[in-house]
Amino acid sequence: MTVTIVGLGLIGGSAARDLARTGLASVQIGVESDPDHLRTALQLGLIDRELALAEAVTAADLIILAIPVDAILRILPDVLDRITDRQTVVDMGSTK
């Protein structure tokens, strides 16, 4: 299963770590605006690669949104326009 994680901070990074440990995801794709979070996730092996949001959503079986709720509301229409009935979107949004 290919998993895209949008947001690699505390929540998204923890989800990526646990998915990597269990082997449930064959490929993990990260979408992250903070270059330090992205670099750390790649160095720790939490994600296999980074893609832009549109590409990452299209490539995934499971999309995890782990960003603040206001940011989810901004990107959700684009995400939902790109998914098929074979993909799942999970909201792990946090308020800040």
Put a short name on every predicted segment.
Residues 1-58:
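NAD(P)+-binding Rossmann beta1-loop-alpha1 motif at the extreme N-terminus of oxidoreductases
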Residues 92-96:
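Rossmann-fold NAD(P)-binding glycine/threonine-rich loop
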Residues 53-90:
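Rossmann-like NAD(P)-binding element
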